[in-house]
UniProtKB/Swiss-Prot annotation:
It is found in: Nucleus. GO terms for cellular component: nucleus. This is Probable inactive poly [ADP-ribose] polymerase SRO3. Residues 238-305 form the RST domain. It comes from the Eukaryota. Interacts with STO. It comes from Arabidopsis thaliana. Keywords: Developmental protein, Nucleus, Stress response. Induction: By salt stress.
Amino acid sequence: MAAQVEIEDQESVTNLDNGEIINPISDNAPNFSGDATILLREATFEHNLIKNCFLSGMGSFATETTIVTVRKILTQRLITTKAKFAVFKLFTEAMKRKNNGYANIRYGWYSGSKEEIDRVITYGFSNREIKKVENDVGSHGVGIHLVHHRYSLAAALVGEGDEEGIKNILLCRVILGKPEQIVTGSKQSYPSSNQFDSGVDNLENPRKYVIWSCNMNSYILPTYIVSFKSHLLRGLIGRARSPCVSFSVLMSILSKSLDAARMNLILTSYDDFRKRKLRREQLVRKIREVVGDNLLFKILKNQRR
């Protein structure tokens, strides 16, 4: 397992905005938004920091995950990215004034298809991203959902890969301000009062951050794109035509390892999935909650042999 790597919140990675020497773009490297990004050279401090941060949050899946590229979104090259960076700094200062000098800036992962991430980098977040969680019974409010930087696996699991199995994930700087706890399944879409600025799943140990639509392009600044491959993840949540283990086979394997109560929880969710009441990523999330990542990892790895 990758060693735990901590990205200092607030200003640590902020100070890396001077740029990096870059590698030539390889033929299979995802290409994002032209001049808005640069490809970071492997083994440099900045590349390793982001790579290790991602892998340290992948748990058992880290050893079966390959980083393809790490790209940096430049804040000073284009007029649009300059403007977004200026807006983010402006709202950071405003949040400090509101909350006694503390803006509470964090780092969070956001997953999506290459096309979605490219669109977010170019134009910002929109209602298309909000709609992803509107009907999700497991969401914590209706807004832009990001995952704490220590728990990248949760974001990696729901990302959509391309035909070569490459998935992409954004590391964003996020202004949380004073968050409020949002319960699972909530349809809340804005702060409950002027006292609060954002939402979290848990106040003591947050894993999910929720930024409301009214602030989504002010409180979130996309900073890095990690492109990666994992045959185990592709097998679990990839297209139905090419999984390494089908859900029906997985149900059979799990029935030999789980007690009746836990197995019934999974079978109920699986039945909802087949009736199209649940999306694939929602079923995967339920399986993770009930089974645990370690057992799931062992099952998927054994099926690859």
